[in-house]
């Protein structure tokens, strides 16, 4: 950093620039149960010591600025400052470190992910002394998490609403994602739900475009829901995307969905913003609506391993802000996601208590106390041959969502839904009988296809489809 210069005054104030580490690097500090803890992967500029870089992260994301200021003397910096309390080198990487920072709870507004992120992942990410900076994990203490409502309903309450237990829930994103008229869209929804799926879904970029205005879509989808429910005797849902250009318009769409009797709405929580998402989550709890969350834009933030923010942090933020489902990758499909890393943040979404486990990318033990859990949604390039692996990886408390893997069936949408339902129930039955899904998965699907022509046709179409690319963001 710049050389230290000071100018004394008659009031005990020393103007000038000081090294950050003089005040913000405190390896002797013992963290408190009420601290928010952060693990940053940092790459300092050449010549910047890691202790100075870690202290700069702590300072610039809490009380510090680049020079000493008069008003430091009007408050207690020791009470409010962030502290870099540990630094460790990243194995196998040159000039890269994990900096651990503790933040006092009083720095953050209660119940506001927006305020928390404005500090922790704010201007510090553009700091010139750092070549790159990534927030790897966050420990949210119960003293802070209890100020959030969290998911509108949670896993158990949703199962009770749907009266569906003991298996993953099945969904489908309607394709093509853009261009269908509202009536044809509703027809596709009806066919998929009648065929055996639990949910259908608006694609994340379906809002209210000229080819299909939101109100028309909501009306035709509601008709499809009620017709499929009457024919199957099962509760059905369609994720009606309420995301809009303003919070007021978003709420208008959610209110209309509730008036139609729809059980669930949807929000793009990153493009829509945390303030809008939390507002919608509160409305959904108050009015009995489930809330499906899409993570559009996440890869802009989380895919590069040296800079940005890991999705496990975005997942924790979503659980606090509120959502009953959130997309979480597939491990086996077309989208990025390493198995152990994915399971690490899936546990952070579903479980009450998650132990520190660096082999899964979990830097801190996280205690959610009584906050409801979130269904992870596996979606993106998956089909019936993936069903055993998906069931084994994600378990029952998940939503498995097949868009092209339903609508691409050679016989049509309803047979595509039948194929997925048959494959899912075959995998659940085989697992419950003690069979090894990882080893016997293909055999289980082949056996089930002998008595399901819909599944047999799907198996033939997608037998050669694989997405075998190396994951970029690895541990």
Swiss-Prot record:
Keywords: Acetylation, Calvin cycle, Carbon dioxide fixation, Chloroplast, Disulfide bond, Lyase, Magnesium, Metal-binding, Methylation, Monooxygenase, Oxidoreductase, Photorespiration, Photosynthesis, Plastid
Modified residues (N6-carboxylysine): 201
Domain of life: Eukaryota
InterPro entries, A to Z: RuBisCO, RuBisCo_large_chain_AS, RuBisCO_lsu_C, RuBisCO_lsu_C_sf, RuBisCO_lsu_fd_N, RuBisCO_lsu_N_sf, RuBisCO_lsuI
Reactions it catalyzes: 2 (2R)-3-phosphoglycerate + 2 H(+) = D-ribulose 1,5-bisphosphate + CO2 + H2O; D-ribulose 1,5-bisphosphate + O2 = 2-phosphoglycolate + (2R)-3-phosphoglycerate + 2 H(+)
Cross-referenced PROSITE patterns: RUBISCO_LARGE
Subcellular location: Plastid, Chloroplast
PTM characteristics: The disulfide bond which can form in the large chain dimeric partners within the hexadecamer appears to be associated with oxidative stress and protein turnover.
UniProt site (Transition state stabilizer): 334
Signal peptide per UniProt: none
A GO molecular-function descriptor: magnesium ion binding
A Pfam cross-reference name: RuBisCO_large
Main EC class the enzyme belongs to: lyase
Assigned GO CC terms: chloroplast
Cofactor binding remark: Binds 1 Mg(2+) ion per subunit.
EC number(s) on file: 4.1.1.39
Residues holding substrate: 123, 173, 177, 295, 327, 379
Residue positions of the active site: 175, 294
Note: The basic functional RuBisCO is composed of a large chain homodimer in a 'head-to-tail' conformation. In form I RuBisCO this homodimer is arranged in a barrel-like tetramer with the small subunits forming a tetrameric 'cap' on each end of the 'barrel'.
Alphabetical list of PANTHER family matching this protein: RIBULOSE BISPHOSPHATE CARBOXYLASE, RIBULOSE BISPHOSPHATE CARBOXYLASE LARGE CHAIN
NCBIfam families with a match to the protein in the record: PRK04208.1 (NF003252)
Family: Belongs to the RuBisCO large chain family. Type I subfamily.
Known role: RuBisCO catalyzes two reactions: the carboxylation of D-ribulose 1,5-bisphosphate, the primary event in carbon dioxide fixation, as well as the oxidative fragmentation of the pentose substrate in the photorespiration process. Both reactions occur simultaneously and in competition at the same active site.
Subunit description: Heterohexadecamer of 8 large chains and 8 small chains; disulfide-linked. The disulfide link is formed within the large subunit homodimers.
Protein name, per record: Ribulose bisphosphate carboxylase large chain
Lineage: Eukaryota, Viridiplantae, Streptophyta, Embryophyta, Tracheophyta
């Amino acid at each position: 950093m710049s050389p230290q210069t000071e100018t004394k005054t008659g009031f005990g104030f020393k103007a000038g620039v000081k090294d950050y580490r003089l005040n913000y690097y405190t390896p002797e500090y013992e963290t408190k149960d009420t601290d928010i803890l952060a693990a940053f992967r940092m790459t300092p500029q050449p010549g910047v010591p890691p202790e100075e870089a870690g202290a700069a992260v702590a300072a610039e994301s809490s009380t510090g600025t680049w020079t000493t200021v008069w008003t430091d003397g009007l408050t207690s910096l020791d009470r409010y400052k962030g502290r870099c309390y540990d630094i460790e080198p990243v194995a196998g990487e040159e000039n890269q470190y994990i900096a651990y920072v503790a933040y006092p709870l009083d720095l953050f507004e209660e119940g506001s992910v927006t305020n928390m992120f404005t500090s922790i992942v704010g201007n510090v990410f553009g700091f010139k002394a750092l070549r790159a900076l990534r927030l790897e994990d966050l420990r949210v203490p119960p003293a802070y998490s209890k100020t959030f409502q969290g998911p509108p309903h949670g896993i158990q309450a949703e199962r009770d609403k749907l009266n569906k237990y003991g298996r993953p829930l099945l969904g489908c994103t309607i394709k093509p994602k853009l261009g269908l008229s509202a009536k044809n869209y509703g027809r596709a929804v009806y066919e998929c739900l009648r065929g055996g799926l639990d949910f259908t879904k608006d694609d994340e970029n379906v809002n209210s475009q000229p080819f299909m205005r939101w109100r028309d879509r909501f009306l035709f989808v509601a008709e499809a829901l009620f017709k499929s429910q009457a024919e199957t005797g099962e509760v059905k849902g369609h994720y009606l995307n309420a995301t809009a250009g303003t919070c007021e318009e978003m709420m208008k769409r959610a209110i209309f969905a509730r008036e139609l009797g729809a059980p669930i709405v949807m929000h793009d929580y990153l493009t829509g913003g945390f303030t809008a998402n939390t507002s919608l989550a509160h409305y959904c709890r108050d009015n009995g609506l489930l809330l499906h969350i899409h993570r559009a834009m996440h890869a802009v933030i989380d895919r590069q391993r040296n800079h940005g923010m890991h999705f496990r942090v975005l997942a924790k933020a979503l659980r606090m802000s509120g959502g009953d489902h959130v997309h979480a990758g597939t491990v086996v499909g077309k989208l990025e996601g390493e198995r152990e890393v994915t399971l690490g943040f899936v546990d952070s979404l579903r479980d009450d208590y998650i132990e520190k486990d660096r082999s899964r990318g979990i830097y801190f033990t996280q205690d959610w106390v009584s906050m409801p859990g979130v269904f992870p949604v596996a979606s993106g390039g998956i089909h019936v041959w993936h069903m055993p692996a998906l069931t084994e990886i994600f378990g029952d408390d998940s939503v498995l969502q097949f868009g092209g893997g339903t609508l691409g069936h050679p016989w049509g949408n309803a047979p595509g839904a039948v194929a997925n339902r048959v494959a899912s129930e075959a995998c659940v039955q085989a697992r419950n009988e003690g069979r090894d899904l990882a080893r016997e998965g293909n055999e289980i699907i082949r056996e089930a296809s002998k008595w399901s022509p819909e599944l047999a046709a799907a198996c033939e179409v997608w037998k050669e489809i694989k997405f075998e690319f190396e994951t970029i963001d690895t541990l």
